[in-house]
């Protein structure tokens, strides 16, 4: 009988406790930063917590970490994640632009250059909510880098990257296959838009014996294309296609228009990325390299870029400016001439809608009634994100700390919540306790007497061990 009972009894762990190394550990600075960011992502409301509470959450996640509140504060400041850090790196003042040549603007808008916001689009007359302000196709179209291998095998359009589901014979009958290489177009429009660029970028490697000095070295381009795919380096891929478009444009207008856009060097942008631990840069996927490694990568890309354009080399500084210019002006990888003039506001007055067919471009629609003389704005970030996240993304990717009305209101609300949360919580707890006591003892209340045998010592509270005895059925 006793043996039967013993077989039904076992010692188990409760509260889903997991064995953890309890020995103290001093975490690496990147571990601490990653932990804080993980906390913020799991619960965005924690971004407005004070340092003591944030430190407590870090310790709760990693009880064995030997880390002080002071070190957490110092690391967040070092990596530009302390929101009230006045030393956060910005680069908006280093962004330059000039008036755009040969631009055909919509009838109801015009460009104004200001000292504080640079170029901007302003309404020439009142615009009603829902009105189509303008639509435009890309000045520079960049196909999806991820579809490069599908383009090579005729599984995607060689110009726009759209996946193809038609049979090869049908494509041939429509005259959409290339008569030199294996690539195909998805439509007459794409074949027309590609023009001579397709053959310049991908065909002259078929004439290795030609003594004619090539404007574009196709073999070097295909090598760069594969390198960009391997490294997931969309900006290098994009500026190579942009420069190819510019040097083959006999009018020279495209180069002038690209040069007139908001310009900044990529190494300047990287300082902001590096100061934020690389975590919130949507254009770089959060990848972080130390400065020396990043410069080495840029120089490899630069050498490959130069080999593509043997007759039209650019200086290394200009290469970095091209990359920075592309990164702050592109939308869905494409570059639009008029849309690139829209400045940011977290509560923008326009809605920019990209088409499912990326070659069709975009539409800009009035998000509310816009008065004559009012600046047209768009939002560079998701307006539903917390003010802390929006401002980090804007600082890293576009170089400024937003001070729009929405940001100011959100910050004020955060401060009010922080100051009133504890007081309200305590007040609610007291009210609940008083109500429960009143319900339990009635209106007369109770009076407690001190026991005659009381010796002044408190009895220890009941304490449960982490191990309990369970009986198995």
UniProtKB/Swiss-Prot annotation:
It comes from Candida albicans (strain SC5314 / ATCC MYA-2876). It catalyses: L-lysyl-[histone] + S-adenosyl-L-methionine = N(6)-methyl-L-lysyl-[histone] + S-adenosyl-L-homocysteine + H(+). Belongs to the class V-like SAM-binding methyltransferase superfamily. Histone-lysine methyltransferase family. SET5 subfamily. It is found in: Nucleus; Chromosome; Cytoplasm. It comes from the Eukaryota. Gene3D superfamilies: 1.10.220.160, 6.10.140.2220, SET domain. It is an enzyme of class 2 (transferase). Pfam families: SET. Its EC number is 2.1.1.-. This is Histone-lysine N-methyltransferase SET5. One of its GO terms (cellular component) is cytoplasm.
């Amino acid at each position: 009988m006793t043996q039967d009972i013993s077989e039904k009894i076992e010692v188990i762990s409760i509260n889903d406790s997991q064995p953890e190394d309890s020995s103290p550990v001093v975490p690496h600075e990147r571990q601490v930063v990653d932990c804080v960011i993980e906390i913020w992502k799991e619960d965005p409301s924690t971004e407005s917590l004070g340092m003591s509470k944030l430190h407590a959450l870090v310790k709760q996640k990693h009880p064995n970490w030997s880390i002080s509140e002071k070190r957490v504060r110092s690391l967040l400041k070092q990596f530009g994640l302390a929101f009230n850090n006045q030393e956060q790196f910005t680069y908006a003042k280093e962004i330059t632009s000039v008036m755009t040549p040969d631009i055909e603007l919509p009838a109801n808008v015009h460009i104004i250059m200001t000292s504080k916001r640079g170029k901007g689009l302003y309404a020439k007359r009142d615009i009603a909510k829902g009105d189509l302000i303008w639509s435009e196709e890309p000045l520079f179209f960049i196909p999806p880098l991820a579809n490069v291998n599908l383009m090579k095998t005729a599984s995607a359009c060689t110009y726009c990257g759209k996946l193809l589901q038609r049979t090869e014979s049908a494509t041939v009958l429509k005259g959409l296959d290339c008569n030199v290489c294996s690539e195909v177009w998805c439509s007459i429009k794409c074949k027309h838009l590609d023009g001579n660029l397709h053959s310049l970028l991908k065909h002259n490697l078929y004439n290795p014996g030609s003594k004619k000095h090539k404007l574009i070295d196709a073999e070097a381009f295909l090598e760069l294309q594969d390198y960009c795919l391997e490294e997931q380096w969309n900006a290098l891929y994009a500026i190579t296609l942009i420069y190819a478009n510019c040097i083959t444009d006999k009018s020279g207008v495209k180069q002038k228009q690209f040069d007139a856009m908001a310009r900044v060097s990529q190494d300047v942008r990287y300082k902001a990325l590096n100061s934020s631990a690389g975590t919130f840069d949507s254009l770089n996927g959060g990848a972080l390299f130390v400065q020396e490694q990043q410069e080495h990568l840029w120089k490899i890309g630069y050498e490959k870029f130069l080999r593509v354009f043997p007759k039209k080399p650019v200086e290394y500084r200009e290469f970095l400016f091209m990359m920075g210019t592309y990164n702050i002006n592109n939308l869905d990888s494409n570059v639009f001439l008029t849309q690139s003039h829209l400045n940011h506001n977290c509560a923008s007055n326009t809605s920019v809608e990209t088409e499912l067919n990326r070659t069709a471009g975009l539409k800009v629609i009035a998000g509310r009634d816009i008065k004559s003389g009012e600046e047209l704005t768009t939002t560079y970030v998701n307006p539903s994100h917390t003010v802390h996240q929006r401002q980090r993304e804007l600082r890293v990717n576009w170089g400024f700390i937003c001070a729009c009305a929405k940001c100011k209101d959100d910050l004020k609300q955060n401060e009010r919540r922080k100051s009133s949360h504890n007081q309200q919580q305590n007040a609610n707890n007291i009210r609940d306790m008083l109500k429960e006591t009143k319900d339990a003892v009635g209106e007369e209340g109770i009076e407690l007497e001190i026991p005659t045998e009381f010796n002044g010592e408190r009895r220890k509270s009941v304490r449960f061990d982490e191990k309990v005895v369970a009986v198995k059925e």
